[in-house]
Amino acid sequence: MQMNRLDQAFAALADPTRRGIVVHLARGEASVSDLVGLFSLTQPTISSHLKVLESSGLISRSRVAQSRPCKLETQQLKAVTDWLERVQELWEGNFKRLDALLAELKQAQKEERKK
């Protein structure tokens, strides 16, 4: 995934309403009117949030008669998750090295006290 796309996804997810929309869409498709009722926001406000989510690739909207159901795009969400997991692995590696260093220092202190 290009970094620009990742940046767009994180920017989209920075807003609590958009995160709420993503959580709701994880349960299944929803129309704009469904989301308006759920979040007690105006239709233009919800549409604005959906536009940001759609441009980031996190959701897609189709046209069914007069409705435009929204659905979560799991591929883009997986790319975000994969990036976070890589960062988590780096941090866990740092913590493991720190734990090993602390264990070494404790052992050295014990040996020093015995002298």
List the predicted regions and their residue ranges.
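C-terminal regulatory/oligomerization modules of transcriptional regulators
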Residues: M1-R5, H24-L38, Q43, V52-S56, ...
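Short helix-coil-helix linker/hinge
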Residues: A12-T17
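Pre-recognition alpha-helix immediately N-terminal to the DNA-recognition helix
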Residues: R19-I21
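Short, Lys/Arg-rich nucleic-acid/phosphate-binding segment
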Residues: S47, R63-P69
